[in-house]
Amino acid sequence: MSNSNIQSVQKTTTAQAVNGRARLLGVYFTHSATPATLTLKSGGASGTARLTLTSPAAAGSQDLIIPDAGILFESGIHIGVSSAEITSVTLLFEGGAAA
């Protein structure tokens, strides 16, 4: 039995995903055949990048489970996508609240 309260949030465009202090535990995203970049920042759109992922040149989906206690985002989690090629982003997180 887990002692944590893992939550999820899903977005389809650049947006604030989580408000408040949170730990990112996992990411799942879907994309089309053109490479694009997904950036997760702490502190809003102009905040500090904590994780950057690039999609391959093939349509599909990618997932990343972050080990141990995850990545700490002190001031929420903001999703930034470089283009509409990234069609959906789902975050698994602990703490904070979905935006």
Show where each model-derived region lies:
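Surface-exposed coil/turn segments at beta-strand junctions on protein surfaces, enriched
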Residues: 19-20, 57-59, 72, 84
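Noncatalytic modules at the cell exterior or secretory-pathway interfaces
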Residues: 25-27, 70-84
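Local beta-strand/beta-hairpin segments that build beta-sheet-rich folds
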Residues: 14-19, 47-56
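Exposed aromatic-hydrophobic patches
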Residues: 62-69
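C-terminal interaction-tip segments
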Residues: 1-22, 30-32, 82-99
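A short, sequence-level motif marking secondary-structure junctions
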Residues: 54-59, 95-96
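Short, surface-exposed beta-strand/strand-loop-strand elements in extracellular ectodomains
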Residues: 33-53, 91-92
